[in-house]
């Protein structure tokens, strides 16, 4: 992957989109963004290759159209959102002795009185 640099135009656009003004603090943002972009180039080197998933009929990581599997292309590749039963109240009560009125009791940490 070619080395990408944050130009002053791109940085100005990022500041505008972020509703920030160009100040000394915001200028440090350009370096951070460049670091993030460089990190993604490092991560891209570790492509896992074809998927080997016995639960699918397509273990090559490609959908029927030959595209890489993604949610937009092949929504059937990702698992379905199915509500499964959770813990019963009886099981929850076994997790903690601090249980009252159907809820876990916790110290008042938000107002500093804990």
UniProtKB/Swiss-Prot annotation:
- Reported EC number(s) for this entry are 6.3.5.-
Please give the catalytic activity noted in the UniProt record: L-glutamyl-tRNA(Gln) + L-glutamine + ATP + H2O = L-glutaminyl-tRNA(Gln) + L-glutamate + ADP + phosphate + H(+); L-aspartyl-tRNA(Asn) + L-glutamine + ATP + H2O = L-asparaginyl-tRNA(Asn) + L-glutamate + ADP + phosphate + 2 H(+)
Biological process (GO), any one = translation
Domain of life the protein comes from: Bacteria
- Annotated Gene Ontology MF terms? asparaginyl-tRNA synthase (glutamine-hydrolyzing) activity; ATP binding; glutaminyl-tRNA synthase (glutamine-hydrolyzing) activity
Class in the EC hierarchy, top level: ligase
The alphabetized UniProt keywords are:
ATP-binding, Ligase, Nucleotide-binding, Protein biosynthesis
Sequence intervals crossing the membrane = none
Query: In the UniProt record, does the keyword Protein biosynthesis occur?
Result: yes
Q: What is the role of this chain?
A: Allows the formation of correctly charged Asn-tRNA(Asn) or Gln-tRNA(Gln) through the transamidation of misacylated Asp-tRNA(Asn) or Glu-tRNA(Gln) in organisms which lack either or both of asparaginyl-tRNA or glutaminyl-tRNA synthetases. The reaction takes place in the presence of glutamine and ATP through an activated phospho-Asp-tRNA(Asn) or phospho-Glu-tRNA(Gln).
Q: Which family does it belong to?
A: Belongs to the GatC family.
Query: What is the protein named?
Result: Glutamyl-tRNA(Gln) amidotransferase subunit C
Q: Give the organism the record lists.
A: Treponema pallidum (strain Nichols)
